[in-house]
Amino acid sequence: MKKSIVNDIGLYKTRLLSMLTEDSDICGLLLNKEDFTEAEANGLPYSQIFPYLYINTQAETKTCLCFEVDVPQIPTGMIKDMKITAWAYSPFDQMPYEKEGFLGTRPDILADMIERKLHASSQFGIGQLRLESVTSSVLDSRFYGRQMVFTVPDFKTKG
């Protein structure tokens, strides 16, 4: 089967979901405990880690991590630009969080953990992901967080 440019959106999302659920610091922050089971970590996708922007306004409010992958431009016949946008957000009543080696509010610390994890990865594109921006975001009247944008060039199609 011939590969498509859009196929890498799903590939990046699959890799991100796997990487983020395997990180003990990220899972500990989301689960709000240091000691958690593998089953609890495996339960995070689609409950607190989403491969799309999602704000659950109906259920219990929890800290969440969302991400989206885009192809903003295809500058040459061989290379395309990939963009990963990540949102780390918490309810206003869950802002305090402490973890050795990290500073800030819960969304700040989660954003820092995400950046450290992605910066160390070589699973995306050609070279390292480049952090383009980190901005604050009020997602609705109950949630505050950070939006991060990463970019990396990648081959137009693979295979």
Protein language model features and the residues they cover:
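Short, flexible/disordered intra-domain loops and linkers
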Residues: 3-4, 95-105
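Solvent-exposed residues in well-ordered beta-strands and their adjoining turns
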Residues: 70-72, 87-91, 151-155
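Small/polar-rich, solvent-exposed N-terminal microdomains that initiate assembly or binding
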Residues: 1-76
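Acidic-leaning, charged glycine-interspersed low-complexity segments
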Residues: 28, 104-159
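Residue-level signal for secondary-structure boundary sites
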Residues: 75, 92-96, 156-158
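Short, solvent-exposed beta-strand/turn "edge" segments of beta-rich domains on protein surfaces
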Residues: 73-79, 139-143
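Hydrophobic residues positioned within well-ordered beta-strands of beta-sheet architectures
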Residues: 65, 82-84, 146-148
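Short acidic, glycine/tyrosine-flanked loop/strand segments centered on an H-E-D-like triad
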Residues: 81-98
